[in-house]
Amino acid sequence: MADLDDIKDGKDFGIGVPQQNPAFTLKGCGSLDWGMQSRLARIFNPKTNRTVMLAFDHGYFQGPTTGLERIDINIAPLFEYADVLMCTRGILRSIVPAAANRPVVLRASGANSILTDLSNEAVAVAMEDALRLNSCAVAAQVYIGTEHEHQSIKNIIQLVDQGIRYGMPTMAVTGVGKDMARDQRYFSLATRIAAEMGAQVIKTYYVDSGFERIAAGCPVPIVIAGGKKLPERDALEMCYQAIDQGASGVDMGRNIFQSEAPIAMLKAVHAVVHKNENAETAYKLFLHEKG
């Protein structure tokens, strides 16, 4: 320990220079605790406040669907090209190398399959385990307008309450019932309810008409789901339109890992999200990277 006689008086105190602490500018997140902001800053690039997430959590209800038969073979080579990985704790522990050094959004709801009612989910991960896995956020479905709406909202509330206690963001993922219309009115309702319950990030679907109203009416960042597999040019157009209309990023799965050139597709999506490239320019990049 330094002796008092060895301590030199400080001289450069910057007198007259106001103390600097740049504001956290991610939409709706400026008043969150430091730990939660720190995790969100790993998910959303602080230079753009946007993100490219790679979702490969589908097996929690679909099993080994096309493209996810072998995560170690099909998905692991993509890790370095994504900003964030979204997966289950089972896959994270068994296949994702800790040295991949990518922030993780951990799937935290489940307990059903494609053989049953998908809306009947429960919280499937303890917050302590999410912390143990060094997750940057937890994610759960919310099914507005379905038979199990109440339980899915309770799941979000539970994760939000526990997340606030530990500094862990919650991403609410808007599921859609079989008979629900995927339109602006529905997603405006679903995203706003999830945000009002305290979710710090919302994942939802892009719609061709009125998406800018969905994004404007949601007080926290929205990332869009990729949804079903589209031709690469169409998927890039969807990304561009979503970002242009207010989305803060994408969380894509099938449109990446079922692409004929997944790495090239990730690079093209990255160009749209972080460099504001239009779909045509991004598609040319895709073709170039595809070779």
From Swiss-Prot:
GO CC annotations on file: cytoplasm
Pfam name, any one: DeoC
Molecular function GO labels: acyltransferase activity, transferring groups other than amino-acyl groups; fructose-bisphosphate aldolase activity
Family: Belongs to the DeoC/FbaB aldolase family.
Function: Involved in the degradation of phospho-AI-2, thereby terminating induction of the lsr operon and closing the AI-2 signaling cycle. Catalyzes the transfer of an acetyl moiety from 3-hydroxy-5-phosphonooxypentane-2,4-dione to CoA to form glycerone phosphate and acetyl-CoA.
Subunit structure comment from the entry: Homodecamer.
Highest classification ranks of the organism: Bacteria, Pseudomonadati, Pseudomonadota, Gammaproteobacteria, Enterobacterales
Recorded name of the encoding gene: lsrF
Protein name per UniProt: 3-hydroxy-5-phosphonooxypentane-2,4-dione thiolase
Organism for this UniProt entry: Yersinia enterocolitica serotype O:8 / biotype 1B (strain NCTC 13174 / 8081)
Compartments where located: Cytoplasm
Keywords: Cytoplasm, Schiff base, Transferase
EC identifiers of the protein: 2.3.1.245
Keyword Cytoplasm: yes
InterPro entries: Aldolase_TIM (IPR013785), DeoC/FbaB/LacD_aldolase (IPR002915), DeoC/FbaB_aldolase (IPR050456), FbaB-like (IPR041720), LsrF (IPR033673)
Location of the active site: K203
Catalysed reactions, as listed in the record: dihydroxyacetone phosphate + acetyl-CoA = 3-hydroxy-2,4-dioxopentyl phosphate + CoA
Family matches, as Gene3D superfamilies: Aldolase class I
